[in-house]
């Protein structure tokens, strides 16, 4: 039986081709599959009865992810890549090879064309895998006729049968110049990379001639050959037409949230898909620019040869900083890939919003699950707090209110911190808790049944201290703790005890919703404050400071305080002229 979380996600599946990844309780991928229609295929696991291995697989599924593609053939090719990468337990048959054919040009003195089932690091050229084994075989035979290499076993003092048929260059009885092989290999590689128009045209002419001569069986054979060529070497979005290592970034923004998709194309294949989802502080383009720089600043992150990004990005500056081309494709296969990534970004964000809507309708008992877990009497009102700042500047706090498991937005509050001038979680908590509840006491308003802090013991202890020792009131306080992946994980009590909720329970969904909402609200408010006095906007107003200079200052100093503290000589060492450096110092004093 599917959990409520899975039931909700099943309602949101698209009627599109793609791949799905089934995950267990530890978020490990245990099965990868492909589908012409993701909605129908994934639902079938949970809406039908199963036996044996499939029944065991379904019993272990706790979550799933999808990647949409443009065609079911792309889904097939992506499935193979994902299986080879993740090696899911229930895809055991594909672990030692895909089971699907590749066409290989061997790395030998006298090279051959072969059909193989695995890719090896042996210097050969591999093309595929191909969904249709028969079509791949027929295409191989066509290539052997049109662009022959060696088809015999090698030198045997006399010409082989294939040489007489024009399907072997003659390694069987003579020394074949390497230049001749290289010429043929170049043509074969071009053909298998999708440049088939010349051969198709020749085949079509032969088919017409055969029809005119009433050789209908021959015409049908040629027609089938054309079909096999199209099936085998048809251009795919998941497989690019060159081996350039490239990363592709796409985004979708809505309701203050930004969804990112990162596609890593290696060896002409989509080798990795990463996704990020977070509240957007700046414009989506600026957020993505910042994200890309941080992305490649991580340890062990290797730069590709090329980066593809949406329009509106500062490609020139990104390219200068990273030292590689950053482009926005306008047409063709790369543009299609970018659109596919953007479509995936949109679906991920829409799924989040629609899941929240579905969860909101199922709040019965969710509040009680949280209070029961904390050993508290059942209540109705939760108030949650979070702080936000950037490099210790523009410090703000925000509070959201949930009544009976639903957000009560008229009760939301924003706070500009007055007594804290640097990043200090305890001090920020003390100030906002005192301001909020001293006011409620003064107004004789209703107090909440539970206070949740976005954090752990530091925030909890500071809040309890203010409530007990300064205000003399007893309101339970708990922390919302995140895991290493920055996702909601546990509750923390006033005694520093971590309490886990069932990740698929309504109580956990409510906790996750509250944490996401207070974080979003705090960041949105911080963005408003920061935009009025942000580092970027202050620098933009300084005469002589353009985009490149701004990037240099941001990368080297990070805050107005640090730039103000720098000497004119320090600024000059970044390649900034003395006049502009003096202007910067003067402007930031005001």
UniProtKB/Swiss-Prot annotation:
Localization, UniProt: Cytoplasm
Keywords: Cytoplasm, DNA damage, DNA excision, DNA repair, Excision nuclease, SOS response
GO molecular function: DNA binding; excinuclease ABC activity
InterPro entries found in the cross-reference section: GIY-YIG_endonuc, GIY-YIG_endonuc_sf, GIY-YIG_UvrC_Cho, RuvA_2-like, UVR_dom, UVR_dom_sf, UvrABC_protein_C, UvrC
Entry-linked SMART domains: GIYc
UniProt GO BP: nucleotide-excision repair; SOS response
GO CC terms of this entry: cytoplasm; excinuclease repair complex
Residue intervals of the GIY-YIG domain: 15-92
Gene3D superfamilies: 5' to 3' exonuclease, C-terminal subdomain, GIY-YIG endonuclease, UVR domain, UvrC, RNAse H endonuclease domain
Pfam families reported for this sequence: GIY-YIG, HHH_5, UVR, UvrC_RNaseH, UvrC_RNaseH_dom
NCBIfam families, sorted: uvrC (TIGR00194)
Role of this protein: The UvrABC repair system catalyzes the recognition and processing of DNA lesions. UvrC both incises the 5' and 3' sides of the lesion. The N-terminal half is responsible for the 3' incision and the C-terminal half is responsible for the 5' incision.
Subunit field text: Interacts with UvrB in an incision complex.
Protein's name according to its UniProt entry: UvrABC system protein C
Gene: uvrC
């Amino acid at each position: 039986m599917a959990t409520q979380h899975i039931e909700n996600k099943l309602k949101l599946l698209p009627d599109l081709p793609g791949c799905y990844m089934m995950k267990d309780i530890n978020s490990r991928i245990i099965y990868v599959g492909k589908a012409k229609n993701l909605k129908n295929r994934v639902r079938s696991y949970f809406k039908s009865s199963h036996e044996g291995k499939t029944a065991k697989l379904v019993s272990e599924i706790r979550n799933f992810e999808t990647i949409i593609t443009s065609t079911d053939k792309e889904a097939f090719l992506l499935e193979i890549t994902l299986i080879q990468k993740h090696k899911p337990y229930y895809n055991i048959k594909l672990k030692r090879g895909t089971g699907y054919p590749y066409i290989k040009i061997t790395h030998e003195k006298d090279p051959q064309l072969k059909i193989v089932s695995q890719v090896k690091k042996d210097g050969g050229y591999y093309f595929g895998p191909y969904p249709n084994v028969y079509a791949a075989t027929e295409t191989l035979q066509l290539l052997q006729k049109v662009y022959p290499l060696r088809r015999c076993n090698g030198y045997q003092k006399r010409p082989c049968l294939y040489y007489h048929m024009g399907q072997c260059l003659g390694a069987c009885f003579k020394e074949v110049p390497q230049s001749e092989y290289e010429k043929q290999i170049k043509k074969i590689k071009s053909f298998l990379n999708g440049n088939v128009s010349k051969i198709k045209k020749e085949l079509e002419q032969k088919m017409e001639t055969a029809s005119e001569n009433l050789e209908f069986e021959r015409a049908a054979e040629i027609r089938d050959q054309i079909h096999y060529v199209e099936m085998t070497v048809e251009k795919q979005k998941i497989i690019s037409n060159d081996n350039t290592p490239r990363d592709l970034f796409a985004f979708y923004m809505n309701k203050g949230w930004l969804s990112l998709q990162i596609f890593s194309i290696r060896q002409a294949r989509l080798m990795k898909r990463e996704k990020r989802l977070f509240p957007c502080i700046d414009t989506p383009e600026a957020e993505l620019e910042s994200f890309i720089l941080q992305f490649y600043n991580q340890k062990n992150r290797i730069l590709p040869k090329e980066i593809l990004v949406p329009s509106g990005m500062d490609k020139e500056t990104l390219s200068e900083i990273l030292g590689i081309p950053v482009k926005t494709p306008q047409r063709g296969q790369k543009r299609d890939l970018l659109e596919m990534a953007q479509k995936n970004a949109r679906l991920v964000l829409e799924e989040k919003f629609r899941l929240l809507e579905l969860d909101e309708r199922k709040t019965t008992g969710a509040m009680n699950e949280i209070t029961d877990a904390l050993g508290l009497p059942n209540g109705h009102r939760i108030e949650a707090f979070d702080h936000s700042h950037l490099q210790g500047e523009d410090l703000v706090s925000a509070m959201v209110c949930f009544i009976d498991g639903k957000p009560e937005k008229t009760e939301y509050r924003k706070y500009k911190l007055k007594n804290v001038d640097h990043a200090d979680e305890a001090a920020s908590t003390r100030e906002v808790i005192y301001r909020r509840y001293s006011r409620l006491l003064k107004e004789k308003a209703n107090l909440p049944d539970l206070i949740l802090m976005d954090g752990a013991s530091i925030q909890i202890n500071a809040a309890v201290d203010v409530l007990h020792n300064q205000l003399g009131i007893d309101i339970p306080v708990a922390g919302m703790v995140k895991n290493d992946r920055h996702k909601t994980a546990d509750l923390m009590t006033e005694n520093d005890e971590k309490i886990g909720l069932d990740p698929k329970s309504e109580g956990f969904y409510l906790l996750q919703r509250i944490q996401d909402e207070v974080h979003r609200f705090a960041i949105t408010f911080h963005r408003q404050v920061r935009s009025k006095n942000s580092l970027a906007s202050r620098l933009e107003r300084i005469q002589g400071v353009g985009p490149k200079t701004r990037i240099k200052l941001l990368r080297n100093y990070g805050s107005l305080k640090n730039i103000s503290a720098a000497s004119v000589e320090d600024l000059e060492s970044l390649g900034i002229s003395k006049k502009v450096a003096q202007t910067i110092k003067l402007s930031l004093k005001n």
